[in-house]
Amino acid sequence: MQSAKQKQNNLILYRRRMGFTQKQVASLLGQRDTSMISHYEHGRALPPLIVALRLEIVYRVPVAFLFPAMYEELKGRIRETEASATDRTINATQQ
């Protein structure tokens, strides 16, 4: 199940900035209809990596800009894990 942060994205914002309709984006992504575009935009589904990279190309912005809440959440978790790993390494070498 997705958290509220994971559902937040900027897909509609960047689609509109580019002046595209959902139908145009679906076509650029090689999809037959707009249903998955709508699901992605409203946070009902996360695009697979290949689709996320295609969106990055279509909208001309990094994937992190398209999904900023998810990016920040993941970055925070990784930084915490890095800090813990560094602390464990320092403690192990001091003993």
Residues covered by each model-derived region:
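A short, Lys/Arg-rich alpha-helix, primarily the initiator
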Residues: 1-17, 91-94
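The alpha-helix within a helix-turn-helix
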Residues: 15, 26-27, 56
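Residue-level detection of the helix-turn-helix DNA-binding "recognition helix"
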Residues: 16, 30, 42-44, 71
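Short alpha-helical DNA-recognition segment
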Residues: 19-39
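Base-recognition residues in the alpha-helical recognition helix of bacterial helix-turn-helix
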Residues: 38-39, 50, 68
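Short, basic-rich loop-to-helix N-cap that marks the start of a DNA-contacting helix
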Residues: 43-57
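Short, charged recognition helix plus adjacent turn
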Residues: 57, 64-95
